From Swiss-Prot:
Catalyzed reaction equations: iminosuccinate + dihydroxyacetone phosphate = quinolinate + phosphate + 2 H2O + H(+)
One of the Pfam families matching this protein, by short name: NadA
Gene: nadA
The protein's name in its UniProt record: Quinolinate synthase
GO terms (BP aspect): 'de novo' NAD biosynthetic process from L-aspartate
GO molecular function: 4 iron, 4 sulfur cluster binding; metal ion binding; quinolinate synthetase A activity
Free-text comment on the cofactor: Binds 1 [4Fe-4S] cluster per subunit.
């Protein structure tokens, strides 16, 4: 059985669209109808004509698609496609911060659960966090769950950022160290460094550019050779878009287990059996939708 052919057949039969994140396996990227970062995927999810959305990404992304498309069927091909960082932030963390800073707006990275988003004033992605926080009429902002992105936002906006929880992080980006920076410069002396803002502050400081994955794609045209400090599959995406340029992963072991849970086989099974359906309780979805839509409005 040719899985790709079967997926294309079922996709047509179900009137489905496949949305994939930049960190997906190469073969999954190759069959997707749209590939993007969290912000691009959220925007694309507001313009879906299909009846079924198959989300090749982790659970919080599929939840966001469902929140923005309550009347459509949203499928996630694997229950293992979870985000460890999103699960670090509990509602209690937000409520505790609100007790200490009652007037501070709650800004949540989209890498959070739907339940947490219901308590947010606005959501952000790594692509628009600085822009959105700058526009907020407050010098103190509660921000979660990524402490490294919180550091970057504080540096770029000059505002007091309260990270919730205090140690929230992405285990993939947390791996990158100053040793990786030194090694990258030795191995590729002509390359510049593109670094994701989920990396630790010491690594961020060595960047030629700090950008979300969408930002990396936009700015890759500025130089001919890059070392990429983010999930390794981003290198495949960049090489495909810019075949004339050179891209190197800063670490081969920088891979997200949750993202890799999505395969051609389970995308096929997902379309065949219409599983696993993503559901978000109406009250949570209604509140979270406000925060997501406010983000989309503030970052046009």
């Amino acid at each position: 059985m040719d899985l790709v052919e079967e997926i294309l057949r079922l996709k047509e039969e179900r009137n489905a669209i496949i949305l994939a994140h930049n960190y997906q396996l190469p073969e999954v990227q190759d069959i997707a109808d749209f590939i993007g970062d969290s912000l691009e995927l959220a925007r694309r999810a507001t313009r879906v004509d299909a009846d079924v959305i198959v989300f090749a990404g982790v659970d919080f992304m599929a939840e966001t698609a469902k929140i923005l498309n309550p009347d459509k069927v949203v499928l996630i091909p694997s229950r293992e496609a979870t985000c460890a960082m999103a699960n670090m932030l509990k509602v209690e963390h937000i409520l505790e911060a609100k007790r200490k800073y009652p007037n501070a707006p709650v800004v949540l990275y989209v890498n959070s659960t739907a339940e947490a988003k219901a308590y947010a004033d606005v959501t952000v992605t790594s692509a628009n966090a600085v822009e959105v926080v700058k526009k907020l009429d407050s010098d103190v902002v509660i921000f979660g769950p990524d402490k490294n992105l919180a550091h970057y936002v504080a540096k770029m906006t000059g505002k007091k950022i309260i990270p919730v929880p205090s140690k929230g992080h992405c285990y993939v980006h947390q791996k990158f160290t100053l040793d990786d920076v030194e090694r990258a410069k030795k191995l590729h002396p002509n390359a510049k460094l593109m670094i994701h803002p989920e990396c630790i502050p010491e690594v961020q400081e060595k960047a030629d550019i700090i950008a979300s994955t969408g930002g990396m794609i936009k700015r890759a045209c500025e130089w001919d050779e890059w070392v990429v400090f983010t999930e390794r599959e981003m290198v495949y995406r960049l090489r495909k878009l810019y075949p004339q340029k050179k891209f190197y992963p800063a670490r081969e072991d920088a891979f997200c287990i949750g993202m890799k849970a999505i395969t051609l086989k389970n995308i096929y099974e997902s379309l065949k059996d219409m599983k696993y359906k993503v559901e978000v309780p109406e009250e949570i979805a209604r509140k979270a939708r406000k925060a997501i839509e406010r983000m989309l409005e503030m970052s046009k």
